[in-house]
């Protein structure tokens, strides 16, 4: 089954959910209709596992802008399959969870699920794109849909702030990504990702390789909340909990990691890439794990834990990047192990972190708070969530018999492998191992700290907002199913790695099925070795620190002096002040000022173009025949135009302006263009009448006398504009070697069936221009409608 059917099916479901916005009786079912989308996607990707295992890729391509190699090009490979299954299967759980979380009466269900579907569609688009520009389009669509979902409760100031902050950071990162993709196109001449991966060595030798790599890293780090771009993720927790469980733990924040996995065969050829990604990941890991301990909000703890876990995965992506330089031998086996560990932990993290977010959402929904200072003793009210969150948190901490233990062991194995690889030198390698172990200890500490503060201790009824607390079964079901997966993966890990991780590894390493021979076999017991010793140290030290130390007091003092968020706010306010000054300087409500700026910029661009390429070779200048009438009209237009500069009376100015317009119409008539003359006459008549009628609405403000200095400037600018236009006409006349585009439009009848060439141009050849012009008119009309129906609401909140 082609990818087009999957994408088409998702679009149809989105349209049906959109229809429920306007059909009141169907609004309550919007969530269940939307649930069909992740179910459909899950079924599709599960059905493709046998094909991908046998090396068969599902491909689909429609030309879009083939001249610049921008096409609707989709390709499902092993890496895309793994991410597609995570997005769709976690999506089934989250969509069902959201139907129980949101209120039919209070929340706009169609709007929420439409945004969620748009996000899922965009995320799937990223992982199956085989064209860099197409991937960028979906990349920015995830930012837009994330903005809409975070600001879903738009009356909440925190939601607005979180949405704006995440949008600014991720969109700027997206622009950096686009810059990197453009550089790749300059280097190779193609935007097709599968072709780019075959040219990795020639790309790495190009002068633009390092700038391109930096741009791609900025795009990945901003999307995956890596230090110092992590600040948007905690603020995004203002979104409804289903959004946090889906976007900000399991899917969207993995997009940057997906990008680096995808381009590892190219980027891994640089040692700088390995250094940057590894150390950024480890710094993010330890920063997130320490910062999680100063949070009182359960979602805040999970936000920083997500940042920490993403850093852990990112460090493995960086360490394993050396596979691009060593595709065979013992080193290839070690790099393969590291990349395998990163992919395996990515899957495990999606499961246990989504379960944790769902548990927190249920507590918040039923108890009315997420503040751990008010939630002690919750085990008696939420026994199922106590079990779910305990298993999920301990899995994240790396406790045996849970899936997180296996991938944490492989992470430690990766750190130990760094010693064997001698990638960083002995000193840096020791630092790498130390950071990884210390960050893992803090991961254990905040996992136990979260459970202790929420479920242990005595319940205080006075601190909890809601008095009738219960734990609905349907609400808990998705989290329970995810919890069950945690020990299952521990006991049968190779079933999942062989069907998901291994196909993805083939693409990440770019070795194909030959990587199967060196891929690791996951075992629950490897004997007593260094990774196991690290795990024991983490558990023992973590327990002592979690139970004996007051982390809230310590971390608050340490981190408050180094707040990245405050730096972001200062930079944001600085840009806001600067942009305000610029806008006030440019937008001074003087139309002639706007016209002068526009004319000067237009003329400067023409002058710059002439300076760069020079004027065309001068041929004989042909002047059209003209008679006395043309000369009289030309003199009259010039005289009236100069007079307009000095006249102050409004009515006189409008009449003189009309005279110029009618004179131009006569010019068209003399040049044998009656249709243009008629159009000019109609437009000039209508605008003149509108000007005169509008005078009755304008205030009777005395007009100042003409200022010769200002009027002289206007005359000079007018001559500059006239010179620019004449120059363009001159250039057009000298372009004898260039074929005129007007000949193409003579095919109007054959290509469009239209007998009127103007209609054919507007409706076919320039259809997009016409459509967007119509959209502009609609937007302008909506603005006018709003102004006409505006009511004075001073003293009220401007957003109400």
Curated annotation (Swiss-Prot):
This is Putative antiporter subunit mnhA2. The gene is mnhA2. It is a multi-pass membrane protein. Belongs to the CPA3 antiporters (TC 2.A.63) subunit A family. InterPro entries: CPA3_Na-H_Antiporter_A, MrpA_C/MbhD, MrpA_C/MbhE, ND/Mrp_TM, Proton_antipo_N. GO terms for cellular component: plasma membrane. The keyword Transmembrane helix applies. GO terms for biological process: monoatomic ion transport. Keywords: Antiport, Cell membrane, Ion transport, Membrane, Transmembrane, Transmembrane helix, Transport. It is found in: Cell membrane. Coiled coil: none annotated. It holds the Pfam family MbhE. One of its GO terms (molecular function) is antiporter activity. The keyword rRNA-binding does not apply. It comes from the Bacteria. The chain crosses the membrane at residues 3-23, 29-49, 78-98, 109-129, 133-153, 167-187, 202-222, 249-269, 273-293, 300-320, 337-357, 387-407, 428-448, 472-492, 527-547, 596-616, 627-647, 651-671, 676-696, 712-732, 768-788. May form a heterooligomeric complex that consists of seven subunits: mnhA2, mnhB2, mnhC2, mnhD2, mnhE2, mnhF2 and mnhG2.
